[in-house]
Swiss-Prot record:
Phosphoenolpyruvate binds at R298, R334, N456, D457, R467. General (non sugar-specific) component of the phosphoenolpyruvate-dependent sugar phosphotransferase system (sugar PTS). This major carbohydrate active-transport system catalyzes the phosphorylation of incoming sugar substrates concomitantly with their translocation across the cell membrane. Enzyme I transfers the phosphoryl group from phosphoenolpyruvate (PEP) to the phosphoryl carrier protein (HPr). One of its GO terms (molecular function) is phosphoenolpyruvate-protein phosphotransferase activity. The lineage of its organism: Bacteria, Bacillati, Bacillota, Bacilli, Bacillales. This is Phosphoenolpyruvate-protein phosphotransferase. InterPro entries: PEP-util_enz_mobile_dom, PEP-utilizing_PTS_enzyme, PEP_util_AS, PEP_util_C, PEP_util_CS, Phosphohistidine_dom_sf, PTS_EI, PTS_EI-like. It catalyses: L-histidyl-[protein] + phosphoenolpyruvate = N(pros)-phospho-L-histidyl-[protein] + pyruvate.
Amino acid sequence: MSKLIKGIAASDGVAIAKAYLLVEPDLTFDKNEKVTDVEGEVAKFNNAIEASKVELTKIRNNAEVQLGADKAAIFDAHLLVLDDPELIQPIQDKIKNENANAASALTDVTTQFVTIFESMDNEYMKERAADIRDVSKRVLSHILGVELPNPSMIDESVVIVGNDLTPSDTAQLNKEFVQGFATNIGGRTSHSAIMSRSLEIPAIVGTKSITQEAKQGDMIIVDGLNGDVIVNPTEDELIAYQDKRERYFADKKELQKLRDADTVTVDGVHAELAANIGTPNDLPGVIENGAQGIGLYRTEFLYMGRDQMPTEEEQFEAYKEVLEAMDGKRVVVRTLDIGGDKELSYLNLPEEMNPFLGYRAIRLCLAQQDIFRPQLRALLRASVYGKLNIMFPMVATINEFREAKAILLEEKENLKNEGHDISDDIELGIMVEIPATAALADVFAKEVDFFSIGTNDLIQYTLAADRMSERVSYLYQPYNPSILRLVKQVIEASHKEGKWTGMCGEMAGDETAIPLLLGLGLDEFSMSATSILKARRQINGLSKNEMTELANRAVDCATQEEVIELVNNYVK
């Protein structure tokens, strides 16, 4: 008899295969065992650290190839944990001073760190706790000589079943054999869920009981469209889901026909669909999905996973590669956005109570021009290889933009004097992420060439709600009328001055938001490359005039719920 288990749909698609239970290894040890050879035990711990670094570096490099640099960046964070003296030194001291065995010392110290970080009302610190837990498990396995599960060794068609998949588990999945996965815990924003979408593997998380309900070798259906897992389906259910899977793949194939199509509404209004990228390694997906440009090139990934700043020459080569590959299509490059949830070990940034509102992005770059100027020089030199736009992140005041522009113009003059060719067709813009910037959009619009609305931060700053906090996640409301009014204000201010506005947050690729944004007059929608074809099909079926009427009604609503109901009634 079949069994239906409900979970959270994390990644689209339908998978049908036998269950492969990811069994947790036995990492038990005698916590009270004391050692006499202290130096030998410290050496055992140090060797486990080095072995973990080797493994994680391989996993990180594989993840960059399969998933792109932005998804691989989590392993840069894991490698930083293994180099953190504030974590490593107390473990070594515990072995030396208390004769603790390496496994016990590691577990005691990392548990303390995890407890402290998890209690903080700061999402970056909570994510760091998860990193420490994952890394600690890997180091412990080397101390004990126990192998961790290795999904990369799977060589038959399976659906993986487990309590949870760590980022390193997910990064090692082979798409040829792993048809999908289902876990007890997790949510749509967990690392494994995000990676499953990049791999385009159907996934269900948060089932609570899948490891109790499924046995090794059971037939499993994962319906990533509805959040259903079926264990040991009946013959009729198998036939029905095989048909559903075929229809899903047929739809994906149909979408591919739109790869080279225009994005134009039924009443003839054009929109631009661009892609977000982290490094040149992301370019194949951009081209395969028919992006009309790059609306966000996150340059911070060039700075991560290394122990020193990238040189001007290294940056120049990366920017040049992207501009040449896009063959004259617009490439919007965001200057370094470090701080907040992104750290660089070699910068020694100060610890802050609230790093998201602190020393980050343009604030850091203006203060540390030895970082900022080489990046601007590299961008200016690369500008002759394509259509380059530059935007500054986290701009709060017009003076910040003016100062950043002045530095850029100064470096442009320096480069010309050095004999370099520089394009005279570079547009300069800003990210609109701060409510104050949106409120003064009319002032900024007189001086910038374009706006790019970063909705991820704009929403949480406007509603004072951390989008990663479960307790206040109900307040993270993309369709709240206050957000729509700010977006409208920014777009109208830019159009009044003959400028354009794009959007590069998650909202830009959201099927509920797209009709509203189209109606508000958004010029460019920048999203993950895998969302582009669906968005193109959606926009090509909408009327701009009708969506304008919809948007005008939406900004007059009182609640997000009213807006969603309005959209659902308009767009059926």
